[in-house]
Amino acid sequence: MVVPLYVIRHAHAGSRSAWLEDDRLRPLSDKGWQQAQALAERIAPLGPSVLLSSPYKRCMQTLEPLGELMGMTVQEEPRIEEDSPLERSLAAIEDAPDNAVLCSHGDVIPGFVNGLIRRGMDIGEGPHALRKASVCVLHHVNGLFTHAEYWDPPSI
């Protein structure tokens, strides 16, 4: 049976260059909160099993509306935080339960997707870059990732 994992690039956050505090604490913008709510409404009917997020605030916040809608807690997954080594992020993906939703960063997701492609996963006509609040759906059978699809960010 083919089973999905939903990997979300965090929603829109304020400008990195304008943020003067620790970047881990940079929150979603108003647009980002709207995107997060739209993602929640799209993903909730799919019955996610668990919500896993980079510990960065913008990632945790991206999954908060989904958690509220589903009555689930967003769990931190440090192996998918920004600048995470490929081996660590790949292990997090491989360890994630079926139908999990994960939220990570634009520098991490392409790395493990490329790692899975090298292992034989087909991405078809995937995007050249993952936009904020986009979703990469990774399909696997018995732990072997077979193909992926890309969902554009919600229109806001």
Segments from the language model and where they lie:
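Short active-site segment of divalent metal-dependent hydrolases/proteases
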Residues: A13, E87, V108-I109
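Short alpha-helix plus adjacent loop in nuclease-associated cores
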Residues: E81-I93
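Domain-level recognition of soluble alpha/beta enzyme cores
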Residues: G120-H147
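Generic beta-sheet signal
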Residues: L5-Y6, P97-D107
